């Protein structure tokens, strides 16, 4: 390139060009162009607008249990240990189950709303209410025997007895907590998040006030804190219901209670059960890890408790992006827009990855001081600082895995997530962590090293699966779930046949497959309509509905009765 002259006659030297291989240069330019395209920027803004309030709402819910621990911690060590164990029991055997089962709505509601089959969203909510209320009975059976379970785990008898008192008071709170989970999904599928934040703030104000009044004014101790927690759960559910009713958010999606809510339970549970395992496997692993840390020594337990709290708070950011992913991807697929779903998926992974990287760097930089938020014990602080360099990369992989899980929920592929979670945690990571913890005598440092194996396996497996996703095919399946297309309209290619066979387990019913619960059903589908609520799959007759739903109720109640019998037997023994 020859030198040129400007308007004043000065010589302008051409800039030096950096020689880059043509293929590599093209890839870099295309990557930058894609990352900075208007579509990606708009999508990132939409995702952040969803993820931010979800983070705040989740933080508000998390604070309710933390407040109970803080108040009871001032009563004494036994009271603090009892409340900590009681909250763990409620979370592991109750809240985690409801959270997982309600996650089926992330798929069904978001896809139906995206496909403009609005009344179907309300029917799915009704279906979820009935199924989750039935699931309360088995959870209550475990609640009734909390003391016995804790004694089997070699916990202090006084702590176990007091924990049983706390859990018993929380029994009526479980249906309220489940209903709140469903209400949250109902609003999230429509892109409505802020009401949960407002309600969460109000519930925390009520919780703090009731804890102070019941513990100090009435001197009720742990019992008072339990009642404050239970009241807060009812307050959350009731206030959110009143908000929906007052703002008339339900007008277009709620057609009143209908017999349709008794149909399609198989489709719901095919998504709900894998969703439950996606949530519970990880949740249970951390709770078990905390228990194992207590078997080493008190310092290890204290450090594990601190890191667990930090992990819970840090995970709320990718959790928010996971919810945003399930909503945006589900809405796009329900509308049949495969390109938008792909864009949402790519953008949310970039956003979550950047945020997780920043959080990981921050925690690593603050590794020597972050534990002072929770304790002044020098030994615990020192151990936490040793684990933080391991936790930082753990959080990055965990964030990617959690966000990918949101994408899988949006696409209706929870079964894949459940299988990969099981393999990652119980096939590889957790056994390695326990071996390093005890055999290698590394304590919780070894445990978290094993957990990195879990989440890295999850993250890479999820990413590979998502990269291989046929978005056009998934969009067609989403429209079947949304009641907009018949499965007969899906024209398979020979390569699709193995996939189609698996879709029966993912909630998409093929016309040539007969459900075990119906012999004479017919496929009913109506085209895109805001009023019609088609039943996807076979329609059960009235007699079949009474039999199968009656059996579900009978089994649930029988489990509760068995729990009562075990409790009575143990009390007499």
UniProtKB/Swiss-Prot annotation:
pH-dependence annotation: Optimum pH is 8.5. Active from pH 6 to 8.5.
Membrane is among the record's keywords: yes
Superkingdom in the source lineage: Eukaryota
Pfam families: MatE
Cytoplasmic side, ranges: 1-46, 103-122, 183-196, 247-266, 326-345, 401-415, 465-545
Keyword terms, alphabetized: Antiport, Cell membrane, Membrane, Transmembrane, Transmembrane helix, Transport
GO BP terms, alphabetized: organic cation transport; xenobiotic detoxification by transmembrane export across the plasma membrane
Subcellular location: Cell membrane
One GO cellular component term: plasma membrane
Chain ranges passing through the membrane: 47-67, 82-102, 123-143, 162-182, 197-217, 226-246, 267-286, 305-325, 346-366, 380-400, 416-436, 444-464, 546-566
Family assignment from sequence similarity: Belongs to the multi antimicrobial extrusion (MATE) (TC 2.A.66.1) family.
Protein name, entry field: Multidrug and toxin extrusion protein 2
Species in which this protein is naturally found: Mus musculus (Mouse)
């Amino acid at each position: 390139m020859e030198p040129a002259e400007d308007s004043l006659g000065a010589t302008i030297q051409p800039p030096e060009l950096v020689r880059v291989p043509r293929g590599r240069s093209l890839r870099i330019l295309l990557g930058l162009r894609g990352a900075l395209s208007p579509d990606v920027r708009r999508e990132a803004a939409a995702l952040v607008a969803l993820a931010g309030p979800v983070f705040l709402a989740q933080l508000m819910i998390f604070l309710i249990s933390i407040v109970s621990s803080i108040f009871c911690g001032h009563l004494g060590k036994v009271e603090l240990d009892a409340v900590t164990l009681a909250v763990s029991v409620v979370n592991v055997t109750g809240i985690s189950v409801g959270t997982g089962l309600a996650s089926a709505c992330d798929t069904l509601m978001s896809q139906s709303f995206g496909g403009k089959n609005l009344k179907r969203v309300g029917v799915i909510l009704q279906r979820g209410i009935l199924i989750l209320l039935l699931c309360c009975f088995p959870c209550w059976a475990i609640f009734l025997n909390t003391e016995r379970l804790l004694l089997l785990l070699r916990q202090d008898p006084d702590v176990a007895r007091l924990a049983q008192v706390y859990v018993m008071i929380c029994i009526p709170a479980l249906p309220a907590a489940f209903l709140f989970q469903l209400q949250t999904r109902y609003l999230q599928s429509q892109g409505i998040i802020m009401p949960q934040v407002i309600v969460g703030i109000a519930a925390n104000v009520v919780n703090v006030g009731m804890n102070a009044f019941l513990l100090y004014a009435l001197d009720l101790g742990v019992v008072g804190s339990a009642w404050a927690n239970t009241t807060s759960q009812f307050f959350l559910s009731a206030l959110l219901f009143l908000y929906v009713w007052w703002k008339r958010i339900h007008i277009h999606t709620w057609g009143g209670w209908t017999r349709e809510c008794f149909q399609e339970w198989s489709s719901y549970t095919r998504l709900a059960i894998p969703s439950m395992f996606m949530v519970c496997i990880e949740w249970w692993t951390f709770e078990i890890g905390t228990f194992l840390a207590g078997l080493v020594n008190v310092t290890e337990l204290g450090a594990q408790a601190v890191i667990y709290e930090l992990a819970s708070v840090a995970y709320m950011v990718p959790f928010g992006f996971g919810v945003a992913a399930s909503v945006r991807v589900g809405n796009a697929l329900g509308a049949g827009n495969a390109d938008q779903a792909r864009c949402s998926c790519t953008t949310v992974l970039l956003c979550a990855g950047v945020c997780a990287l920043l959080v990981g760097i921050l925690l690593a930089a603050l590794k020597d001081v972050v534990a002072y938020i929770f304790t002044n014990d020098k030994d615990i602080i020192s151990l936490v600082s040793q684990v933080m360099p391991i936790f930082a990369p753990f959080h990055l992989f965990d964030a990617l895995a959690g966000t990918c899980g949101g994408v899988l929920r949006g696409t209706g592929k929870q079964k894949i997530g459940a299988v990969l979670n099981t393999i990652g945690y119980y096939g590889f990571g957790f056994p390695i962590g326990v071996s390093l913890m005890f055999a290698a005598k590394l304590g919780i440092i070894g445990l978290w090293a094993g957990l990195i194996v879990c989440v890295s396996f999850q993250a890479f497996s999820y990413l590979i699966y998502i990269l291989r996703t046929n978005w056009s095919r998934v969009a067609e399946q989403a429209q079947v779930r949304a009641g907009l297309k018949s499965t007969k309209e899906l024209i398979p290619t020979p390569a699709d046949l193995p996939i189609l066979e698996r879709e029966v387990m993912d909630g998409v019913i093929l016309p040539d497959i007969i459900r075990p619960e119906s012999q004479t059903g017919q496929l009913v589908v109506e085209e895109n309509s805001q009023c019609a609520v088609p039943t996807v799959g076979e329609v059960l007759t009235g007699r079949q509905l009474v039999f199968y739903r009656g059996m579900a109720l009978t089994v649930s109640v029988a489990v509760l009765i068995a729990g009562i019998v075990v409790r009575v037997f143990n009390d007499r023994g």
